[in-house]
Amino acid sequence: MRTSILVIAAIAVAFLVGRLSAQGVEPSCKLCSAVYIPASEVEQYVAVAHATNPIDQQMRSIDLGRARVQVALVHRNKLDAPAPRSVAEHDLVSEVYYILSGSGTNRTSPEIVDAQRRPATDRAVRDLNGPGTNGADLRNAETQQLKAGDVLVIPAGTGHQFTKIDDHITYLMVRVDPDKVVPLMDEAASRKYLEQNRR
């Protein structure tokens, strides 16, 4: 009984110390507004993907104080085998995929075979996910069979590659950009992009 009381007292003290030490913490993004992207806007990006076939479309790039976060829509068509040198790696930006529709096979590993730097002028480097490499293959890769509803988290520095897509795969991607290497994109820029790419 005495041991139980001591454990409970220790937990209470730890909680109180934690609460007191947390009182001096300031928000990392003071007075920042929330960002809302309605389903109707996401659907417009899906329509652009079907009409013009851009694989990766940035919808927003948001400053959160100490970091930035990007929200993108990615649509990939049927793939029977991977293209040469299609392993991608991003040095500073992590990615989270939420699969909306379709299915495919993705491989991931931090061990990239014959990695070569992407040029700074590359659209992906400049506008989407910052500096990184493309590689010929992955060593010790893990394979994920992705389908609607699945989530895949790819840390910065980890190579990733679709090796097969059954019919298509469409996913919402959230990029975590702590070094702020990706330019900002607001709602007005999104509207302009959609107007320019409507068919």
For the regions a protein language model found, what residue spans apply to each?
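Bacterial N-terminal signal peptides
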Residues: V7-R19
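A short hydrophobic beta-strand segment most commonly corresponding to one strand
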Residues: D167-P183
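Positively charged n-region of N-terminal signal peptides that target proteins for export
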Residues: M1-S4
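Double-stranded beta-helix
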Residues: R117-L146
